[in-house]
Curated annotation (Swiss-Prot):
Subunit structure: Tetramer of two alpha and two beta chains.
Source species, domain of life: Eukaryota
A Pfam family assignment: Lectin_legB
Gene3D superfamilies named among the record's database cross-references: 2.60.120.200
Alphabetized InterPro entries for the sequence: ConA-like_dom_sf, Lectin_LegA_CS, Legume_lectin_dom
Organism whose genome encodes this protein: Lathyrus sativus
Family, similarity comment: Belongs to the leguminous lectin family.
Name by which UniProt lists this protein: Mannose/glucose-specific lectin alpha chain
Example GO molecular function: D-mannose binding
Keywords attached to this entry: Lectin, Mannose-binding
Amino acid sequence: VTSYTLNEVVPLKDVVPEWVRIGFSATTGAEFAAHEVLSWSFHSELGGTSASKQS
């Protein structure tokens, strides 16, 4: 089994509106594959308040 990890910090405040929806997408071309998101986290700081989501 091959395992890959993606970890990237992206400053979104300059490129997306205040309210957004985040999605995941993956492909293998013509072949079938199953992809799993085993965990994710989100952190936001707006005007001195902060919100976090860990799943």
